[in-house]
Amino acid sequence: MKYSEAEKKLKTAGCYCIEDGSRHPLWYSPLTHKQFAMSYHRNEEIATGTKHQISKLSGVKL
């Protein structure tokens, strides 16, 4: 799965970007009330461990 595909799923679930950091954009999930980092490289594949971490923090199955 690419970051762009994950971003679409997260936006559909209500997650949104709260800050464009210098290294990674920070996102917020209203489902879990937690923040998590994404990547600016939208065309790259997400590593398996990173995908699981984003899924866990966001509450959205990727």
Regions found by a protein language model. Name each.
Residues K2-D20, Y28-L62:
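Basic nucleic-acid-binding interfaces
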